[in-house]
Amino acid sequence: MRPRLLVSPVNRDEALEAVEGGAHIIDVKNPEEGSLGANFPWVIREIMEVVPEDREVSATVGDVPYKPGTVAQAVLGVAAVGVDYAKVGLYGTKTEEEALEVMRACSRAVREFGYDTRVVAAGYADAHRVGSLDPMSVPEVAAEAECDVAMVDTAVKDGKRLFDFLSEEEVGEFVDSAHEHGLEVALAGSLRHEDMPIVRDLGADIVGVRGAACERGDRNRGAIRSHLVRKLAEALA
């Protein structure tokens, strides 16, 4: 089965472009607040209103600190808006124990309040640049915390991509570990068009992009365009 393409718009117009281009998951984020920067609840709602029922919606809650209560409330907030996935960037957690505490709180918040939102634990391939936990530990943390998806992205958006920090073999090990724990796997990190067949063949369930779907490849100043999304979707086929 080919991976599902996740594209990250910042507003309604970009979301429509992503849908037209064939994105499977519309991922609401705010690049001005970081790699997994959180957008406003009303923006999430505006985007959800234009996404067809046969597509899914995810939302990031930020590159989060080691504050389990704060993060759990944020996850509960996006679950209440009605998204299919809540993505948590484990930015401020330096150890597996800290990450586990944060993600357990997130999973518990969603389940105890009766939502079926899937919880995504995201680590960073360039963790050494920001002092966060080893990304290779994320699948085990996600499984133990009863999350649904293990993800790896990049924290610093300076043009360097996932494979500048992890080899194809290491990414394959991440994918295999997550699958062995019964999790889905999402791969992201300034991925380019030419990376699509690689991440597909490594077994990713979800492939996340923003910059590659934007004009001039610029995730901050460029806008998502449907023809670029379509090329990425075709490259995953």
From Swiss-Prot:
Pathway: Cofactor biosynthesis; methanofuran biosynthesis. One of its GO terms (biological process) is methanofuran biosynthetic process. It catalyses: 2 D-glyceraldehyde 3-phosphate = 4-(hydroxymethyl)-2-furancarboxaldehyde phosphate + phosphate + 2 H2O. Disulfide bonds: none annotated. Its EC number is 4.2.3.153. It comes from the Archaea. GO terms for molecular function: carbon-carbon lyase activity. The active site is at 29 (schiff-base intermediate with substrate), 87 (proton acceptor). The keyword Lyase applies. Keywords: Lyase, Schiff base. InterPro entries: 4HFCP_synth, 4HFCP_synth_arc, RibuloseP-bd_barrel. It holds the Pfam family 4HFCP_synth. NCBIfam families: PRK02227.1-1, PRK02227.1-3. HAMAP family: MfnB. Catalyzes the formation of 4-(hydroxymethyl)-2-furancarboxaldehyde phosphate (4-HFC-P) from two molecules of glyceraldehyde-3-P (GA-3-P). Belongs to the MfnB family. This is (5-formylfuran-3-yl)methyl phosphate synthase. It comes from Methanopyrus kandleri (strain AV19 / DSM 6324 / JCM 9639 / NBRC 100938). The lineage of its organism: Archaea, Methanobacteriati, Methanobacteriota, Methanomada group, Methanopyri.
